[in-house]
């Protein structure tokens, strides 16, 4: 009975010692958090292993992440994974659709993104571009003649319109001279004519009488204006003037209208500020609705695919520029010892318990062996 009690005692003591030793060893990985002193002498094994080697641990963790976890090969493989690409495209389509179907105005969205000043900048930029384009256009066309500047189709239209213009002018002239105003004007012209020709013509005028002269001249003037020959004559005159105009430089226009006035007139007609304001007052949905399907079905998938392809080709350069090892090192270095302990324990809690239990098991087995040795020795 005493033998079995001795074996039980040695086994129990071995298990307790083994379990406690392993438990103490695990605790000594983290504790104490700070070095302890007796007088001027530092107590051995203080601070614990991890607090003591925290800086080295941070460096090694950074290297481990870069060299073994977030490797260019691993990330590149993930980026080219078909399922990953499909999932990312679907996510991007959903997120982009939320943005382009927003009922808020563009102005409100710009204000939310703290870029409300874009309205003023856009107006100024558009006006600047229009001004530069007009000035460049005028600089180029001022070196041409009208014949060179105007398209061939315009030449044809003008030349075809000349006979119609002649007919219109003569028609309006006939209508004018048939009116009382025209007759009165013709009468005044006759009076002025006779007045400028001296006494003899005045005598003829007095003899014939002014009214009779007007009455005789008016039908003849109207008859003259209505003749085909008159129309042809006016057409020929206009045609000659048109030919002269075609040979003249466009730059002569600057004599009558300055460039700045042309630019100012066009900008006033375009109303850039008002146009930009109206555009920004529209909702995002209104602006994007016509191209919504194209954006979702074509633009987004193509953009994501190209982005992933570029990322896969440049992943090593990206990782190098991110300096991940330094980031991990800096983050771990900022952890308090308590947080670092909690982090490690949260990951290895079960395994560390098993190590404690294993120590107790081994201690118990050693106790059994000791008890058997004592039994045989007796």
UniProtKB/Swiss-Prot annotation:
Superkingdom as given in the UniProt entry: Bacteria
Name recorded for this polypeptide: UPF0754 membrane protein BCE33L0760
Entry's Gene Ontology cellular component terms: plasma membrane
Principal subcellular localization: membrane
Coiled coil, from the record: none
InterPro entries: DUF445 (IPR007383), UCP032178 (IPR016991)
Family: Belongs to the UPF0754 family.
Transmembrane segments: 1-21, 357-377
Keyword annotations from UniProtKB, A to Z: Cell membrane, Membrane, Transmembrane, Transmembrane helix
Annotated Pfam families: DUF445
Localization in the cell: Cell membrane
Mode of membrane association: Multi-pass membrane protein
């Amino acid at each position: 009975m005493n033998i079995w009690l001795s074996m039980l005692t040695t086994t129990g003591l071995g298990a307790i010692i083994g379990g406690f030793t392993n438990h103490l060893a695990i605790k000594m990985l983290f504790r104490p958090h700070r070095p302890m002193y007796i007088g001027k002498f530092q107590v051995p094994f203080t601070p614990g292993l991890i607090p003591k080697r925290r800086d080295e641990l941070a460096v090694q963790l950074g290297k481990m992440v870069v060299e073994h976890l977030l490797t260019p090969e691993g990330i590149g493989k993930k980026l080219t994974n078909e399922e990953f690409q499909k999932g990312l495209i679907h996510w991007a389509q959903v997120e982009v659709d939320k943005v382009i179907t927003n009922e808020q105005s563009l102005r409100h969205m710009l204000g939310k993104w703290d870029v409300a000043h874009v309205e003023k900048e856009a107006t100024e930029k558009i006006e600047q571009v229009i001004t530069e384009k007009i000035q460049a256009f005028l600089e180029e066309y001022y070196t041409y003649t009208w014949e060179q500047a105007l398209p061939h189709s315009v030449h044809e239209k003008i030349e075809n319109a000349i006979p119609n213009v002649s007919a219109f002018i003569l028609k309006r002239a006939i209508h004018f001279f048939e009116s009382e105003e025209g007759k009165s004007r013709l009468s005044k012209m006759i009076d002025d004519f006779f007045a400028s020709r001296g006494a003899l013509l005045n005598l003829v005028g007095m003899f014939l009488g002014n009214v009779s002269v007007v009455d005789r001249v008016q039908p003849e003037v109207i008859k003259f204006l209505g003749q085909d020959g008159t129309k042809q004559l006016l057409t020929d005159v206009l045609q000659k003037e048109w030919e002269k105009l075609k040979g003249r430089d466009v730059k002569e226009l600057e004599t009558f209208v300055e460039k700045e006035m042309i630019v100012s007139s066009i900008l006033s007609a375009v109303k850039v500020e008002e146009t930009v304001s109206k555009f920004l007052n529209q909702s995002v949905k209104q602006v994007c609705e016509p191209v919504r399907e194209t954006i979702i079905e074509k633009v987004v998938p193509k953009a994501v695919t190209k982005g992933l392809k570029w990322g896969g080709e440049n992943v090593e350069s990206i990782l190098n520029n991110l300096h991940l090892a330094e980031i991990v090192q800096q983050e771990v270095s900022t952890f308090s010892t308590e947080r670092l302990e909690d982090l490690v324990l949260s990951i290895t809690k079960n395994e560390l318990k098993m190590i404690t239990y294993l120590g107790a098991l081994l201690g118990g087995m050693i106790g059994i062996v000791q008890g058997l040795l004592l039994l045989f020795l007796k």
